[in-house]
Protein backbone atom coordinates (compact mmCIF):
# COMPACT_ATOMS: atom_id res chain seq x y z
CA UNK A 1 0.00 0.00 0.00
CA UNK A 2 2.78 2.45 0.89
CA UNK A 3 5.76 3.37 -1.26
CA UNK A 4 8.17 1.73 1.20
CA UNK A 5 8.61 -1.84 2.43
CA UNK A 6 9.50 -2.66 6.00
CA UNK A 7 12.68 -4.43 4.87
CA UNK A 8 13.84 -1.19 3.25
CA UNK A 9 13.67 0.49 6.65
CA UNK A 10 16.07 -2.09 8.06
CA UNK A 11 18.85 -1.23 5.61
CA UNK A 12 20.02 1.65 7.72
CA UNK A 13 23.45 2.71 8.92
CA UNK A 14 21.92 5.17 11.37
CA UNK A 15 23.56 5.17 14.78
CA UNK A 16 21.00 5.88 17.50
CA UNK A 17 21.91 8.36 20.19
CA UNK A 18 20.09 9.89 23.17
CA UNK A 19 19.49 13.14 21.26
CA UNK A 20 17.04 11.34 18.97
CA UNK A 21 14.47 11.23 21.76
CA UNK A 22 12.37 14.29 22.55
CA UNK A 23 12.02 14.61 26.30
CA UNK A 24 9.22 15.72 28.58
CA UNK A 25 8.32 18.64 28.82
CA UNK A 26 8.98 19.27 25.09
CA UNK A 27 5.71 20.61 23.61
CA UNK A 28 5.63 18.12 20.72
CA UNK A 29 4.83 15.40 23.26
CA UNK A 30 1.64 17.28 24.14
CA UNK A 31 0.43 17.75 20.58
CA UNK A 32 -2.09 15.32 19.07
CA UNK A 33 -0.41 13.68 16.08
CA UNK A 34 -1.88 13.82 12.59
CA UNK A 35 -2.99 10.84 10.52
CA UNK A 36 -0.70 9.98 7.62
CA UNK A 37 -2.66 10.89 4.49
CA UNK A 38 -2.42 8.94 1.23
CA UNK A 39 0.15 6.23 0.58
CA UNK A 40 3.14 8.27 -0.57
CA UNK A 41 5.61 8.74 2.27
CA UNK A 42 8.09 11.58 1.80
CA UNK A 43 11.84 11.23 2.27
CA UNK A 44 11.48 12.89 5.66
CA UNK A 45 8.70 10.47 6.64
CA UNK A 46 10.86 7.50 5.69
CA UNK A 47 13.82 8.92 7.59
CA UNK A 48 11.73 9.19 10.76
CA UNK A 49 10.45 5.63 10.32
CA UNK A 50 14.04 4.42 9.94
CA UNK A 51 15.01 6.18 13.16
CA UNK A 52 12.12 4.59 15.04
CA UNK A 53 12.89 1.10 13.76
CA UNK A 54 16.63 1.44 14.26
CA UNK A 55 16.34 2.71 17.83
CA UNK A 56 14.01 -0.05 19.02
CA UNK A 57 15.74 -2.85 17.11
CA UNK A 58 19.08 -1.89 18.66
CA UNK A 59 17.36 -2.31 22.03
CA UNK A 60 15.71 -5.57 20.96
CA UNK A 61 19.14 -6.98 20.12
CA UNK A 62 20.53 -5.90 23.50
CA UNK A 63 22.85 -3.25 22.03
CA UNK A 64 21.51 -0.20 23.90
CA UNK A 65 24.64 0.05 26.07
CA UNK A 66 26.84 0.03 22.98
CA UNK A 67 25.12 3.21 21.74
CA UNK A 68 24.64 4.66 25.24
CA UNK A 69 20.89 4.91 24.81
CA UNK A 70 18.05 4.08 27.15
CA UNK A 71 16.52 0.73 26.31
CA UNK A 72 12.89 0.51 25.21
CA UNK A 73 10.42 -1.87 23.61
CA UNK A 74 8.37 0.60 21.57
CA UNK A 75 8.39 4.15 20.30
CA UNK A 76 5.86 6.67 19.02
CA UNK A 77 6.55 9.02 16.12
CA UNK A 78 6.39 12.22 18.15
CA UNK A 79 9.12 10.88 20.43
CA UNK A 80 11.55 11.38 17.54
CA UNK A 81 10.02 14.73 16.58
CA UNK A 82 7.63 13.49 13.88
CA UNK A 83 4.08 14.73 14.43
CA UNK A 84 2.44 11.82 12.62
CA UNK A 85 0.40 8.83 13.74
CA UNK A 86 2.82 5.88 13.75
CA UNK A 87 4.36 3.58 16.33
CA UNK A 88 6.93 0.79 16.26
CA UNK A 89 6.77 -2.10 18.73
CA UNK A 90 9.28 -4.94 19.08
CA UNK A 91 9.67 -7.15 22.14
CA UNK A 92 9.29 -10.69 23.40
CA UNK A 93 6.67 -11.70 25.93
CA UNK A 94 7.64 -15.15 27.17
CA UNK A 95 7.70 -17.24 23.97
CA UNK A 96 5.87 -14.73 21.77
CA UNK A 97 7.46 -12.00 19.67
CA UNK A 98 5.40 -8.82 19.33
CA UNK A 99 6.45 -6.96 16.21
CA UNK A 100 4.38 -4.18 14.63
CA UNK A 101 4.92 -0.97 12.71
CA UNK A 102 1.50 0.61 12.94
CA UNK A 103 0.38 3.43 10.67
CA UNK A 104 -2.62 5.48 11.82
CA UNK A 105 -3.45 3.29 14.82
CA UNK A 106 -6.68 4.05 16.64
CA UNK A 107 -8.29 2.35 19.61
CA UNK A 108 -11.93 1.86 18.65
CA UNK A 109 -13.09 -0.07 21.70
CA UNK A 110 -11.88 -0.54 25.27
CA UNK A 111 -12.92 -3.16 27.78
CA UNK A 112 -14.48 -2.02 31.02
CA UNK A 113 -12.05 -4.26 32.92
CA UNK A 114 -8.94 -2.52 34.26
CA UNK A 115 -5.35 -3.79 34.19
CA UNK A 116 -2.01 -2.42 35.30
CA UNK A 117 1.63 -3.33 34.87
CA UNK A 118 3.52 -4.26 38.02
CA UNK A 119 5.63 -2.49 39.23
CA UNK A 120 4.74 0.31 36.79
CA UNK A 121 5.67 1.78 33.41
CA UNK A 122 8.61 3.76 32.11
CA UNK A 123 9.16 5.92 29.05
CA UNK A 124 12.04 6.91 26.78
CA UNK A 125 10.80 10.50 26.91
CA UNK A 126 10.49 10.72 30.71
CA UNK A 127 13.87 10.69 32.45
CA UNK A 128 12.34 11.29 35.86
CA UNK A 129 10.47 8.00 36.26
CA UNK A 130 7.09 8.37 37.98
CA UNK A 131 6.23 5.66 40.48
CA UNK A 132 2.76 4.16 40.61
CA UNK A 133 0.34 1.89 38.81
CA UNK A 134 -0.70 3.17 35.39
CA UNK A 135 -4.40 2.48 35.00
CA UNK A 136 -5.14 0.82 31.64
CA UNK A 137 -7.94 -1.12 29.98
CA UNK A 138 -7.47 -4.88 30.12
CA UNK A 139 -8.35 -5.25 26.43
CA UNK A 140 -8.33 -2.84 23.50
CA UNK A 141 -9.60 -3.20 19.95
CA UNK A 142 -7.28 -1.50 17.47
CA UNK A 143 -7.54 -0.54 13.81
CA UNK A 144 -4.35 0.31 11.93
CA UNK A 145 -2.20 -0.54 8.93
CA UNK A 146 0.75 -2.75 9.85
CA UNK A 147 3.71 -2.03 7.59
CA UNK A 148 5.41 -5.29 8.60
CA UNK A 149 2.62 -7.66 7.58
CA UNK A 150 1.49 -5.19 4.89
CA UNK A 151 -2.14 -5.47 5.85
CA UNK A 152 -4.81 -3.65 7.77
CA UNK A 153 -5.41 -4.99 11.24
CA UNK A 154 -8.70 -4.85 13.07
CA UNK A 155 -8.16 -6.86 16.22
CA UNK A 156 -8.35 -7.10 19.97
CA UNK A 157 -5.24 -7.13 22.14
CA UNK A 158 -4.86 -8.17 25.76
CA UNK A 159 -2.03 -8.71 28.23
CA UNK A 160 1.22 -6.81 28.09
CA UNK A 161 0.87 -5.99 24.38
CA UNK A 162 -2.41 -4.21 25.16
CA UNK A 163 -0.61 -2.18 27.84
CA UNK A 164 2.16 -1.32 25.38
CA UNK A 165 -0.25 -0.29 22.62
CA UNK A 166 -2.18 1.96 25.01
CA UNK A 167 1.11 3.55 26.12
CA UNK A 168 2.14 4.28 22.51
CA UNK A 169 -1.26 5.44 21.28
CA UNK A 170 -1.36 7.59 24.40
CA UNK A 171 1.73 9.35 23.06
CA UNK A 172 0.04 9.87 19.69
CA UNK A 173 -2.94 11.38 21.50
CA UNK A 174 -0.66 13.85 23.35
CA UNK A 175 -0.52 11.87 26.59
CA UNK A 176 2.20 10.53 28.86
CA UNK A 177 1.92 7.43 31.00
CA UNK A 178 1.97 9.28 34.30
CA UNK A 179 -1.27 11.04 33.35
CA UNK A 180 -2.97 7.73 34.22
CA UNK A 181 -1.44 7.34 37.70
CA UNK A 182 -3.65 8.10 40.69
CA UNK A 183 -1.89 11.16 42.09
CA UNK A 184 -3.33 10.75 45.59
CA UNK A 185 -2.71 6.99 45.87
CA UNK A 186 -0.15 6.01 43.21
CA UNK A 187 -0.10 2.33 44.17
CA UNK A 188 -3.82 1.89 44.76
CA UNK A 189 -5.21 -1.21 43.01
CA UNK A 190 -8.79 -2.36 43.23
CA UNK A 191 -9.10 -6.12 43.86
CA UNK A 192 -11.05 -6.46 40.60
CA UNK A 193 -8.16 -5.14 38.51
CA UNK A 194 -5.80 -7.48 36.66
CA UNK A 195 -2.13 -7.27 37.61
CA UNK A 196 0.24 -7.95 34.72
CA UNK A 197 3.81 -8.84 35.58
CA UNK A 198 5.46 -10.23 38.67
From Swiss-Prot:
Could you tell me which InterPro entries the record lists for this protein? Peptide_deformylase, Peptide_deformylase_sf
Q: Which cofactor does it need?
A: Fe(2+)
Q: Which Gene Ontology MF annotations are present?
A: metal ion binding; peptide deformylase activity
Q: Which reaction does it catalyse?
A: N-terminal N-formyl-L-methionyl-[peptide] + H2O = N-terminal L-methionyl-[peptide] + formate
EC number(s) per entry: 3.5.1.88
Q: Note the superkingdom of the native organism.
A: Bacteria
The record ties this protein, via Gene3D superfamilies, to: Peptide deformylase
- SUPFAM superfamilies of this UniProt entry? Peptide deformylase
Active-site residues, Swiss-Prot/TrEMBL? 168
Protein biosynthesis among keywords: yes
Q: Which family does it belong to?
A: Belongs to the polypeptide deformylase family.
NCBIfam families from the xrefs? pept_deformyl
HAMAP family with a match to the protein in the record: Pep_deformylase
* Protein's name according to its UniProt entry: Peptide deformylase
Organism per entry: Ureaplasma parvum serovar 3 (strain ATCC 700970)
Gene responsible for this protein: def
Amino acid sequence: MYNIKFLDLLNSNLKPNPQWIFKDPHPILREVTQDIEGNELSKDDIYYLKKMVRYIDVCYHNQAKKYKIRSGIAIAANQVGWNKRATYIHFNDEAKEHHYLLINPHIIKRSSEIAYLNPGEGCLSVDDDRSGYVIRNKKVHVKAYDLISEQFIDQEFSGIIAICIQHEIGHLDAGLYYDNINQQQPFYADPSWTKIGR
